[in-house]
Design a protein with these regions (language model features):
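Core segments of alpha-helical transmembrane spans in multipass integral membrane proteins
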Residues: 22-23, 41-63, 79-86
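Individual transmembrane alpha-helices with interfacial aromatic-anchor signatures
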Residues: 80, 109-126
Length: 148
């Protein structure tokens, strides 16, 4: 399998995973149907999920369509999940009163004395896979340029 195809498959997995996991995690009693959330907060979560799902569909289209500028298409497609997951690493530092934990009463898993936030683990995995996918694309592109 070529690096270009492997790259597109890996990036597709990240894009689909980003949309599907986000909807699956938020479409429940801890988020959208949480009775303690004000209706407008629920509205914003649904809007965010719709936007993410729509952008993910566009990213997949950009990734797999024939393009006169495949570098631009691949870069934009890669940025969709990367920009979605990035705030999981800094939002709680920038906005006081926010939390990575949906249910503060539920204990977090602890590994080597460090509390592990599942959201951050998922974000980290997706960011790493997106970087690997993009690197595969760029390394294929550089190899292709050298052969010309």
């Amino acid at each position: 399998m070529s690096k270009a195809k492997l790259s597109r498959i890996l990036l597709s997995v990240v894009i689909v995973n980003t949309a599907v996991v986000s909807v699956a995690v938020d479409w429940n009693a801890s988020h959208i149907f949480n009775p303690t959330w004000v209706p407008h907060a629920r509205f914003h979560d649904v809007v965010m999920l719709w936007l993410l799902s729509s952008l993910s569909a566009i990213a997949l289209w950009l990734l797999w369509r024939r393009s006169a500028e495949p570098q631009v298409s691949t870069t934009v497609a890669t940025l969709v999940p990367m920009l979605f997951w990035a705030p999981f690493f800094f939002t709680t530092l920038l906005v006081p009163g926010t939390s990575l934990s949906a249910m503060p009463d539920e204990p977090l898993p602890i590994i080597a004395g460090i509390p592990i936030y599942p959201n951050v683990v998922i974000a980290t995995i997706n960011e790493i896979l997106a970087v690997i996918g993009y690197w595969l694309y760029r390394s294929h592109n550089e190899t292709f340029k050298e052969e010309i």
